[in-house]
Every structure is written in structure tokens, then in C-alpha cells.
């Protein structure tokens, strides 16, 4: 659904194909775009349609419904920096060490798969998604600019955190005053309770390795 903010008569809706692709004609306006699909969490985005302009390849990313006792972390960004990486680490109540990033995309515990990174996107935009299967622990999530361009603060990034019992994700956008260079400390998750950090680390001790 495309809900126009400036002129309600411009509002409309479209049904995508099975692959999620769609084509639509829109009047110039600012739209609140709500995406719905069976088995997925409803998501809302803002999209500005400029007069006499065509758009191709615009993407609206939605997330599957959560399994019980799990969480999902989705990292999205723009064309620059090209290669951002997700880092999740911590400890479960049962004593398992959890560490997931592009070098170690899955982490097993004594009861099975603790967490998994779906893909390592190296050409901009993302999304990169980590699924966490055990909320009984304390975990930290950070984003690292693999190429250490020092432009993460300039171009920004967004993290969406999906938690059980929540109808919509918590959206965390990089604070423009955080002073981030190449590492962004995003949040801590303590037994399912989200604590937003949104800051630069005291020391940039998350150093990327080779890919």
C-alpha cells in the first residue's frame, strides 16, 4: 500500500509477483509504504516520488515471522561504504560462547545452532541478517566498515531488531553525532531486553580480516 502524505488522492496499492517484483505509476508525493505478505512481518517505509522521474531497482526489505524464542538483526545501508560487516558476540546462560561475523557465519552451542549470518554483502546496501536462536544470554552487536574508509559516520547505516512479542522491529539509525569512524557499537541484548548503545567504541578493537 502506498499512502500519500501530501494528497490523499494519490494513494494506491499494488500486488507484487511471486518473486516480490512490482511496477507502479505514482504521482509526485511522499508516500508511507506498507508491505504485507503471508508469513512475514508487516513493514512500513517512507518513499519520496519526484516529478517526472523514473525509479528502477528500488527495494523494500521485509523479514519472515520469528520462531519462538528467537531474534533477528537486519543491517541495511547505502552504496557507500561498500562493505559493512555485522558482528554479534556474547555468552549464553549455559556457558556457550557466541561469536558470528563474515569469517564465522554460524555458531553452534550444546543445544544446536545458536546464531547464523545469512550472507556477507560486499557491494553496498545489504541487507545482512543475523538470526539469534537463544535469547537466554547477554550479547553485543556492532557494525564494522571492512575497508576502514572512515566514512561510516558520513553515509550512515540502519539496523532493525526483531524481537518476540513485538509487532514491529526496533529501528536504530546511526547517530550523526556519535563520532563513529569504522566501528559502530549498536546495541546490547540482555535476555531479550534491548539496550541501544548507538556510539563509537572506546577503542576500535574489532579489526577485519581478509575475505
Language-model-detected regions and their locations in the chain:
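A short, solvent-exposed beta-strand micro-motif common in secreted/extracellular proteins
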Residues: 28-39, 139-145
Amino acid at each position: 500500500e502506498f499512502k500519500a502524505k501530501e494528497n490523499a488522492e494519490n494513494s494506491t496499492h499494488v500486488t507484487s509477483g511471486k518473486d516480490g517484483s512490482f511496477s507502479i505509476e505514482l504521482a509526485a508525493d511522499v508516500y508511507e509504504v506498507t508491505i504485507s505478505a503471508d508469513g512475514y512481518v508487516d513493514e512500513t517505509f517512507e518513499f519520496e516520488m519526484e516529478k517526472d522521474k523514473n525509479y528502477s531497482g528500488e527495494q523494500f526489505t521485509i523479514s519472515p515471522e520469528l520462531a519462538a524464542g528467537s531474534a533477528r538483526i537486519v543491517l541495511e545501508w547505502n552504496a557507500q561504504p561498500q562493505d559493512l560487516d555485522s558482528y554479534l558476540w556474547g555468552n549464553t546462560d549455559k556457558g556457550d560462547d557466541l561469536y558470528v561475523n563474515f569469517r564465522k557465519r554460524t555458531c553452534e552451542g550444546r543445544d544446536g545452532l545458536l546464531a547464523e549470518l545469512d550472507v556477507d554483502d560486499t557491494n553496498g546496501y545489504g541487507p545482512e541478517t543475523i538470526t539469534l536462536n537463544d535469547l537466554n544470554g547477554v550479547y553485543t552487536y556492532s557494525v564494522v566498515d571492512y575497508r576502514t574508509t572512515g566514512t561510516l559516520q558520513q553515509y550512515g547505516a540502519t539496523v532493525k531488531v526483531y524481537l518476540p512479542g513485538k509487532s514491529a522491529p526496533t529501528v536504530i539509525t546511526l547517530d550523526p553525532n556519535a563520532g563513529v569512524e569504522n566501528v559502530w557499537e549498536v546495541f546490547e541484548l540482555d535476555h531479550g531486553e534491548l539496550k541501544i548503545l548507538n556510539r563509537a567504541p572506546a577503542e576500535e578493537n574489532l579489526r577485519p580480516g581478509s575475505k
